[in-house]
Swiss-Prot record:
Residues 31-254 form the Peptidase S1 domain. It comes from the Eukaryota. Transmembrane segments: none annotated. Its main location: secreted. It is found in: Secreted, Extracellular space. The gene is alphaTry. This is Trypsin alpha. Pfam families: Trypsin (PF00089). It catalyses: Preferential cleavage: Arg-|-Xaa, Lys-|-Xaa. It comes from Drosophila melanogaster. The keyword Repeat does not apply. Synthesized in the midgut of both larvae and adults, primarily in the ventriculus and gastric caeca. Residues 1-22 form the signal peptide.
Length: 256
């Protein structure tokens, strides 16, 4: 998630906003501690691209609606955005759809990262197949310690500037909001009620995975948001809590 590996000034410039000191939104990169996979295993995964380059991840909510992170859509116009779906590779294959419009959560705050969620409407509808499928939104949070998976084309380590061509995934375990904010971990009061965490030793999402899916029990439970470094000890990855933000996603998808 947002990792501490790029100069803060560069990130602020790229994203057009500010973030807490040491807590950086994930830019281009790769899953840490994970494995290569294929899109058929994560058919809801998309690559959100700016001017043809991978920028963030996202999840297919319906044939023409994508769920991603609000910080992925700061200071950008829909005209330079596109989505690649149905491909294991962010740079080729599958189908490419232009972005018609998008909306960030009105309560999104780039300083605290609360409400870090957004909805994208595509210019054309996706045709569902074995490699393009929608994923349901969680209606409640999984139990602390529940198994989950996060996927994306994010960096393999903190500070890496290389982007893998093939989709990566990693298995992690849910860390509840209360547990993530406890003294067990290092975030404290930075964990808010619109966030959920996930962690596993030496495993995490990293720059470039932002906006992508955290899936548990076959439903979307989180949207990759931020964190301290990539797979740093005592700092789980932090995600927008889909169960908490579900009603906003549903209403926005119907109105955007």
């Amino acid at each position: 998630m947002l990792k501490i590996v790029i100069l803060l000034s560069a990130v602020v410039c790229a994203l057009g906003g500010t973030v807490p000191e040491g807590l950086l939104p994930q830019l281009d990169g790769r899953i840490v501690g994970g494995s290569a996979t294929t899109i058929s295993s994560f058919p809801w995964q998309i690559s959100l691209q700016r001017s043809g380059s991978h920028s963030c991840g996202g999840s297919i909510y319906s044939a023409n609606i994508i769920v991603t992170a609000a910080h992925c859509l700061q200071s950008v116009s829909a005209s330079v955005l596109q989505v690649r779906a149905g491909s294991t590779y962010w740079s080729s294959g599958g189908v490419v759809a232009k972005v018609s419009s998008f909306k960030n959560h009105e309560g999104y705050n780039a300083n605290t990262m609360v409400n870090d969620i957004a909805v994208i409407r595509l210019s054309s509808s996706l045709s569902f197949s074995s490699s393009i499928k929608a994923i349901s939104l969680a209606t409640y949070n999984p139990a602390n310690g529940a198994s989950a998976a996060v996927s994306g084309w994010g960096t393999q380590s903190s500070g890496s500037s290389s982007i893998p061509s093939q989709l990566q995934y990693v298995n992690v375990n849910i860390v509840s909001q209360s547990q993530c904010a406890s003294s067990t971990y290092g975030y404290g009061s930075q964990i808010r009620n619109t966030m959920i965490c996930a962690a596993a030793s030496g495993k995490d999402a990293c720059q470039g995975d932002s906006g992508g899916p955290l899936v548990s029990g076959g439903v979307l439970v989180g949207v990759v948001s931020w964190g301290y470094g990539c797979a740093y000890s005592n700092y789980p990855g932090v995600y927008a809590d889909v169960a908490v933000l579900r009603s906003w996603v549903v209403s926005t998808a119907n109105s955007i």
